[in-house]
Amino acid sequence: MLAKHHSPQRTLRRVFSTRSRGVVAMEFAILAIPFCVLFLGTMEVGYDFFVQIALTNAVNQAARSVQVGATQFAGSGTAEAAWVSSAVCPALGRLLDCGQLYVSVTDIPSGTGQNYYTYLSANPPSLTAMVSSSNSAATCGAAAMMLLRAFYLSPTFLGMLVPIWSQASPVKPGIRVHVTYASAGFVNEYFTGGAAC
């Protein structure tokens, strides 16, 4: 009489179909990776919204101080850096690092039909240009059109896994960051003092 021969696939299938021990642990292990990525992605989106709101609030407060003439720069980098650390950084809040903030205040040249929108089209926001001349400021006199721009480099949780969510840091090579941008265009109020544009 010939021995009954079972194929290896049939034997493995029978073993796996009868033994269900560890199946739940295996299912959790399979679902853990997408759950962790989804959880970290949700946390990152929430953090990015928080940074955007904090940066927009800080830019609006700083723009108001320039608009009413409360901020007068002496034209030196020290005065501009002191203004950023005394006026813009406290408005960011304590959870954000002021060392990752880059601010620029420029006047929009009047005349030749130029306004806020044509100036932005001709001078798009550039983080690399702002990093090279960080915290530059120009305070013009009354009724001058001004533009305040700010970039904040925030850390990213999933930047290494999903490169589309982040970009290479222009300050620290090899580190991926999420760049948040806020700007405010305004016309200075009529105040005394201030440099002529």
Language-model features, listed with the residues they occupy:
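Alpha-helical assembly-interface signal, strongest on the long, hydrophobic N-terminal helix that forms
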Residues: 1-91
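Short, conserved structural patches
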Residues: 2-6, 61-197
